[in-house]
Structure formats: structure tokens, C-alpha cells
Amino acid sequence: MNTSVTSIKLVLLGEAAVGKSSIVLRFVSNDFAENKEPTIGAAFLTQRVTINEHTVKFEIWDTAGQERFASLAPMYYRNAQAALVVYDVTKPQSFIKARHWVKELHEQASKDIIIALVGNKIDMLQEGGERKVAREEGEKLAEEKGLLFFETSAKTGENVNDVFLGIGEKIPLKTAEEQNSASNERESNNQRVDLNAANDGTSANSACSC
């Protein structure tokens, strides 16, 4: 039995109040808070799932949607292997913002990043809310930009797990394992350098001069 764990760094992006934090809460705790406080800066959560008999650990960065925090986003999506770009199906402005995030990710994030476009709050359509972003619009954008596409309800849990499982299935686990191995090797090398420096200050100074 394979007991290795593959870590996947995932970031959530989107306008304020589209339900990013609620999606994460539903995925991690299977819970929903009706009046959740806005995220300040970013929140970090983890969740483990089994995909094709392999354990995957999602390291989730839930970023704030307020405009004043937008400049911090690159710090969180840098080196991310996956991103959720979330919009509210009842708010067309949030879909426009989602387009912006997709464009920014393609320009500045890793070229191999897996992006899922997520239309949230479909439960509101059963509660008398009016859909302002057609499903076809989301599907078209996803097809044009090579994205995964889902419509979800963080409130009811509909399709939320499917989003994360879909992303996990798209990321080659071998590649993720190689990245983890390379990271561990770099850390090991750094430790060896520190050890040598401690034993021989002259060598360390010589290296710095180069």
C-alpha cells in the first residue's frame, strides 16, 4: 500500500463575498456559517483526501477579496499548483473580476497551474435569487482558457468536493512528488552548506566572495 503523501498548494481568488471561505470551510469541515466574517489578508487551511488510492494533502490559501488586498495575491499564488477562481452566479461583476484573475494567473503564475473556474451560490436560485451569469458563460470562458468548470453551493455542499477532487485528478501525482523531492533535496543541501560553514569559516567567506 502506498503511504506517501503528495502536497498540492492551492489558492482561492475572487471578488469579496463570493463565498471563497465558505467553499473551503465546507471542504475542510463540512460546515457552513451563514454570516461569515470577511477574510483579512489570507487564511491557511489543509485537508487530506484519497485520490486513486493516493493520499493528497491540499495546502489551501484563501485570499481576501477586498480590493485593498489584491496586491498581496501574487505572494500566495506564486508556486501554486492549482487555483480556484470563484464568482457569484447572481453577481455579474464578480464574473468580470473572475476573468481578470484568470488572465493574471496565466500571465504571472506557474505555466503548469491547474485553474478551476467556480460559479458559487447556486442554492440562491432555488431561494428566489435571479441568475445573472449563465452557466454557458462560465463554460465558454473555461473552454477558451483551458480551465476546469464547476457550479457549486457552499451552503448545501453541492459539487464542492468535486472541485477539489477534479483538481487532484488533473495534477500528475508523479510531478508533484518530484517537486516535493526537489524541495527536500534543496533543504538538505542548505543544511550541508550550513554544516560546512560551521566547521570552516574560511570556506564560507570564500564562497561569499565569489
Swiss-Prot record:
GO terms for biological process: endocytosis; Golgi to endosome transport; late endosome to vacuole transport via multivesicular body sorting pathway; multivesicular body assembly; protein localization to endosome; protein targeting to vacuole; reticulophagy; vacuole inheritance. A motif (Effector region) lies at residues 36-44. Alternates between an inactive form bound to GDP and an active form bound to GTP. Activated by the guanine nucleotide-exchange factor (GEF) VPS9 and inactivated by GTPase-activating proteins (GAPs) GYP1 and GYP3. Residues 176-210 are annotated as: Disordered. Keywords: Endosome, GTP-binding, Lipoprotein, Membrane, Methylation, Mitochondrion, Nucleotide-binding, Phosphoprotein, Prenylation, Protein transport, Transport. It is found in: Endosome membrane; Mitochondrion membrane. It is a lipid-anchor. One of its GO terms (molecular function) is GTPase activity. The modification Phosphoserine is found at residue 188. Changing residue 21 to L/N: Locks VPS21 in its GDP-bound form by abolishing binding to GTP. Belongs to the small GTPase superfamily. Rab family. PANTHER family: PTHR47978. This is Vacuolar protein sorting-associated protein 21. It comes from Saccharomyces cerevisiae (strain ATCC 204508 / S288c).
